[in-house]
């Protein structure tokens, strides 16, 4: 079922939104937690999505466990990034997103390099899933179409789309293998008015 939570203030945190909790459905006991601020430092970026704020810095909106790789894929809308962590250790495996604003050591170690044309990064994504072949599919909200304020798209030029990426985890490359389009033109682009 659907569960809508209310954010609450905690003594040492602004909200409860930046922690993933694994719960035993039989007993209700907490089995494991992953604190996003330990995986991805809160202040490691110089640019965030246009919708981010100090109290809503990650905005997790999808969690996907991949049994083949024993990893968890998380969608951080306000990071404009999809991250993947090792299930057992919580170590960061990779980051899918535009590298602008990230420290160079993160870009070199965790980000993918595009090798296909056309190619577009996603912005403020939702509905991230890992396909059986390892591809990553998502709904790209397309807000601002950039992480850099000076390059933000005007509202009339922003669009949303479905997109599928093929990632090579070893070579650290990424290809855009599907975009919701017909005859070379997007046919399901939701424009902001």
Where are these regions (language model features)?
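Histidine-/acidic-rich catalytic cores in large beta-rich domains
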Residues: 1-193
């Amino acid at each position: 079922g659907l569960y809508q939570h209310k954010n609450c203030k905690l003594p040492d945190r602004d909200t409860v939104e930046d922690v993933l909790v694994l719960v035993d459905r039989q007993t209700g006991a907490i089995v494991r937690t992953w604190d996003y601020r330990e995986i991805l430092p809160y202040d490691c970026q110089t640019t965030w999505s246009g919708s981010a704020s100090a109290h809503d810095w990650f905005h997790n909106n999808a969690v996907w466990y991949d049994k083949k790789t024993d990893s968890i894929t998380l969608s951080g809308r306000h990071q404009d990034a999809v991250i993947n962590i090792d299930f057992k250790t919580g170590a960061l495996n990779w980051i899918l997103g535009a590298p602008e604003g990230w420290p160079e050591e993160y870009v070199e170690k965790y980000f993918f390099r595009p090798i296909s044309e056309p190619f577009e990064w996603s912005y403020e994504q939702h509905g991230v899933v890992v396909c059986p072949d390892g591809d990553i599919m998502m709904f790209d909200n397309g807000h601002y179409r950039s992480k850099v304020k000076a390059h933000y798209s005007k509202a009339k030029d922003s669009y949303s789309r479905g997109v599928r990426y093929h990632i090579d985890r070893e070579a650290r490359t990424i290809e855009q293998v599907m975009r919701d389009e017909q005859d070379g033109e997007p046919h399901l682009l939701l424009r902001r008015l």
